[in-house]
Amino acid sequence: MASIPATVATVAQANMVAPFTGLKSNAAFPVTKKVNDFSTLPSNGGRVQCMKVWPPLGKKRYETLSYLPNLTEVQLAKEVDYLLRNKWVPCLEFELEHGFVYRENARSPGYYDGRYWTMWKLPMFGCTDSAQVMKELQECKKEYPQAWIRIIGFDNVRQVQCISFIASKPDGF
């Protein structure tokens, strides 16, 4: 039989909690006084002259980067490389009639038609090279030359679409 040392607490040890002494004085905390001096506020006043306003009439906005001129093959490949570096799954979608959101079936605020496009094949799980995506883009263009085609980056961990941009537009758009 092994002997186990016994621990016995005395009454004095059981009541060893420090007494409450009240709240501390505010004088112990440092105080910074704010000065109403507007000379240090940030300003872009010097740059306003060189800014331009996007004309809202007659210009369709599609996706990210849609306000830029059409991207070249090299620029598209760089965007796809960015997508792959972030471990997003590339996916191609196309639309034959409307490459932009529009209202046809409902007039309620916040509802738009044209947000869901047809997927080109399957998402490219395991894709590691932008050349693979560019090859699929060329196939989609060959099959549907008058379609809007966009490239999407899908995060399969968070299950969200992280990037989407137009890769090809029909002639005249």
Swiss-Prot record:
It is found in: Plastid, Chloroplast. SUPFAM superfamilies: RuBisCO, small subunit. It holds the Pfam family RbcS. The gene is RBCS5. Belongs to the RuBisCO small chain family. GO terms for molecular function: ribulose-bisphosphate carboxylase activity. Its main location: plastid. Heterohexadecamer of 8 large and 8 small subunits. RuBisCO catalyzes two reactions: the carboxylation of D-ribulose 1,5-bisphosphate, the primary event in carbon dioxide fixation, as well as the oxidative fragmentation of the pentose substrate. Both reactions occur simultaneously and in competition at the same active site. Although the small subunit is not catalytic it is essential for maximal activity. Residues 1-49 form a transit peptide. InterPro entries: RuBisCO_ssu, RuBisCO_ssu_dom, RuBisCO_ssu_N, RuBisCO_ssu_sf. The keyword Transmembrane does not apply. Keywords: Calvin cycle, Carbon dioxide fixation, Chloroplast, Photorespiration, Photosynthesis, Plastid, Transit peptide. This is Ribulose bisphosphate carboxylase small subunit, chloroplastic 5. One of its GO terms (biological process) is reductive pentose-phosphate cycle. It comes from the Eukaryota.
